[in-house]
């Protein structure tokens, strides 16, 4: 307080000099413009003067700061009289005391506010350490301090006053911070580090690995005939960029007899229960009859339609699919569709497998039917799909089906959905191997809905076509053998109605469950097939969870219910989470998916032209997808851009277009947006990566090297392994 006159005198003298300068200018140039500018400038200077005086000379600022430092020193590891950082209640020297009106609420003693702020700051810094003084880190500390005070039961009005003080205390360096900085910058440290020799730049390259066949051979389901052949001669290839610091490894399954057999056994016929295989569970007889209320409500919004002509159906497709279906249409003009066209042609899906998480997963098989069958079913269902999705949205009272939305649209829809609740929580629902658990009863329930959309004159033909999806016959030809099989029910991955049918069944089951719980008036669902996020009020969470797994068991499904989340950014949906980017929410892919999976390719990259085309396409798409997103934008800027124009219609162009299948595509042009402080905070909420860690990762990226190497490069330890991202 003694310095107040000096500060005021200094500021007043500056203001007098500025005012005199302005008056001189006005006298010399007495024009309207000059007078106007002078008045504006004078008002601005006056405002800044008053504001600066108010902030600089706040009577409690210096005293409070010094008190905080003393408290930190009293509880320092270097103090022999250190006091434990524990918040007690009711004691003479306690920071908190019970509220006279409510015992479950605590108030902060006026004489102990600084002490309490420092203790809370200790807890926050114990979690994340000393962070740089930035707006993003201020938000991090603010959230941690607020959560700690809520845990203590502090009165909300006191929390509002205490959080700013606690946040300010978080940014005060401790004695140990000064000591550590002195050690790092000391001459002794430099001398010892010099003994290590020069630090070489990490080098990496493109490593080629072969596909594999699972060693697991178990289960003996009825309806499957296996014929062995010669050994597999040509395995698949997986290309991976090494030396990038990513710790997740991927592999690829070969299209082999062993992989097809295990895929059919464990993804079609049987499920694993306590380490043993058992037949896939069936629903309780009549279980799907309880969905009639949802079907009745949906029918109000579901319009009637008619079958498309072959030409109209072909209008939905381009490229290779158009060529394939065009040939099928020409064939159907010669010979009508028959049941044999619905038989399955089975092969192992070529996909990147996270073998770090699961070294020996069951292979995923693709089971398409003949294009002739798809054309005939598609003439009924291809255009009806969008009508169904709109009807489901109306039945739920808002956007429910998220298929076809861009990442920006999906993020804003999640924000709107979340804001429609007073105190929302999200419950993730994961139906284990959903396609496998789609029973005959579930298919018949779905087919009944499709039939209701068409006139009686067309229902018989549609019913005949759909009935061939219930009793299935399949053939898998592999280089080392073949498998013939029969199965009742199950969803086949190549069917025209796989996506829409799964959406309908999942939405019906969720709506039926929530609608039958008493006193739940508001619930919303985000659905993309078997991937669901149910949002309800916090007060309804226990009622929704109670009995949910058992309910799905009666329907023949094995449902896994994820832990409840109460922060928008922590909603997990299709391996993406909402992140605030450039003022709006956008669905951002999981860090590990982006920074590990995208460094692998199933395309043949032996030639330099193929490598350059692939890396350019992935980098261009990744930068566009993550423009303005912390870490990920800089990660994809590592990918070289060779400014190549891949010839349209070529195999490489088609493969690149098919391979870049982010579930939430983004078409905006790359603008190289700089992540805002709010984005860094939102990114931390979503993936657990602190703003300082984000910046450290970004500073460590360097351009990819495209040379093929014959041995694996040692990976560097990544912050992602410890950040909880």
Swiss-Prot record:
Keywords annotated in UniProt: Nucleotide-binding, Nucleotidyltransferase, RNA suppression of termination, RNA-directed RNA polymerase, Transferase, Viral RNA replication
Domain RdRp catalytic per the UniProt entry, residue ranges: 424-544
EC nos: 2.7.7.48
Checking PROSITE patterns in the record gives: RDRP_SSRNA_POS
Q: Which CDD domains match?
A: Betanecrovirus_RdRp
Q: Name one GO molecular function term.
A: RNA binding
Q: Which reaction does it catalyse?
A: RNA(n) + a ribonucleoside 5'-triphosphate = RNA(n+1) + diphosphate
A GO BP annotation: viral RNA genome replication
Q: Which domain of life is it from?
A: Viruses
What top-level class of enzyme does the UniProt entry assign? Answer: transferase
Instruction: Return the Pfam families for the record.
Output: RdRP_3, Tombus_P33
Q: What does this protein do?
A: RNA-dependent RNA polymerase that plays an essential role in the virus replication.
Q: What else is known?
A: Readthrough of the terminator UAG occurs at position 203.
Q: Give the family from UniProt.
A: Belongs to the tombusviridae RNA polymerase family.
The protein depicted here goes by the name RNA-directed RNA polymerase
Annotated organism of origin? Tobacco necrosis virus (strain D) (TNV-D)
